[in-house]
Amino acid sequence: MCSRGWDSCLALELLLLPLSLLVTSIQGHLVHMTVVSGSNVTLNISESLPENYKQLTWFYTFDQKIVEWDSRKSKYFESKFKGRVRLDPQSGALYISKVQKEDNSTYIMRVLKKTGNEQEWKIKLQVLDPVPKPVIKIEKIEDMDDNCYLKLSCVIPGESVNYTWYGDKRPFPKELQNSVLETTLMPHNYSRCYTCQVSNSVSSKNGTVCLSPPCTLARSFGVEWIASWLVVTVPTILGLLLT
């Protein structure tokens, strides 16, 4: 993340450990699961099934059947899940492979007991794409009498994410945590590298820009200049090539 020999970057790496790929919460018979797209998912309940139940059915939303177990065999219905699901009749678990955002829904497992009564459990599944690697744009950088005015923007396409900016060893204050970092750096709070971490519930990615004191761009990763000099440089180079 930083050039070799910068010990402070080791501390920063510890702050940027990856997030878990699965987030689960339970409220009564409603289970919330958040998973990353492309992963394999197991929908199951935390309690044992009723003894000697007669029938077990998994639904996608409230009326579309995915699979039904009855008379010691499983019937898989025509749906977008066919070929991607497998039922374990012993536990009631439903295995789904390669989930996508289109699989977001409330899944219902309904069990018909031998008494004739029904019992059901609901699992609300949210599938999120992993966040892309952000690009840091240097909006402005200016040396101001031993201080450094810095304005950076952290850009990713069309995503609802959380932003966290880090200096060498610690995050910036909460009030600075958004897609744009605008701050004046003084000698006592100067950092060599500035990292933007974008994250959602299932993934995180980082982009980093590094400076040389007092206010000069050094090595960077995922950084982009908003530079007007390109407009001048490109025609100049073309002119030289044609002469």
UniProtKB/Swiss-Prot annotation:
Please cite one Gene Ontology biological process associated with this protein: defense response
Induction per UniProt is: By IFN-alpha/beta and IFN-gamma both at the level of CD48 mRNA and cell surface expression.
Ig-like C2-type domain sequence ranges: 29-127, 132-212
Where are the disulfide bridges? C154-C196
**Keyword Iron-sulfur: yes or no?**
no
**Membrane topology qualifier:** Lipid-anchor; GPI-anchor
One GO molecular-function annotation for this sequence? receptor ligand activity
Q: Which residues form the signal peptide?
A: 1-26
Q: Which GO terms describe its cellular component?
A: extracellular exosome; membrane; membrane raft; plasma membrane; side of membrane
Q: Which residues form the propeptide?
A: 221-243
Q: What keywords appear on the UniProt entry?
A: Cell membrane, Disulfide bond, Glycoprotein, GPI-anchor, Immunoglobulin domain, Lipoprotein, Membrane, Repeat, Secreted, Signal
The answer to keyword Transcription applying to this record is no
PROSITE patterns cross-referenced by the UniProt entry: IG_LIKE (PS50835)
Q: Which residues are glycosylated?
A: N40, N44, N104, N162, N189
Q: Could you tell me which residues are lipidated, with the kind given as GPI-anchor amidated serine?
A: S220
Write out the transmembrane intervals: none
SUPFAM superfamilies hit by this protein: Immunoglobulin
Cellular location of this protein? Cell membrane; Membrane raft; Secreted
Where does this protein chiefly localize? membrane
In which tissues has expression of this protein been reported? Widely expressed on all hematopoietic cells.
Record text on subunit structure and interactions: Interacts with CD2. Interacts with CD244; this interaction is possible not only on different cells (trans interaction) but also on the same cell (cis interaction). Interacts with LCK.
The free-text function statement in the UniProt record for this protein reads: Glycosylphosphatidylinositol (GPI)-anchored cell surface glycoprotein that interacts via its N-terminal immunoglobulin domain with cell surface receptors including CD244/2B4 or CD2 to regulate immune cell function and activation. Participates in T-cell signaling transduction by associating with CD2 and efficiently bringing the Src family protein kinase LCK and LAT to the TCR/CD3 complex. In turn, promotes LCK phosphorylation and subsequent activation.
> PANTHER family given for it?
CD48 ANTIGEN, SIGNALING LYMPHOCYTIC ACTIVATION MOLECULE
What's the protein name? CD48 antigen
Which species is listed as the source? Homo sapiens
The gene coding this protein: CD48
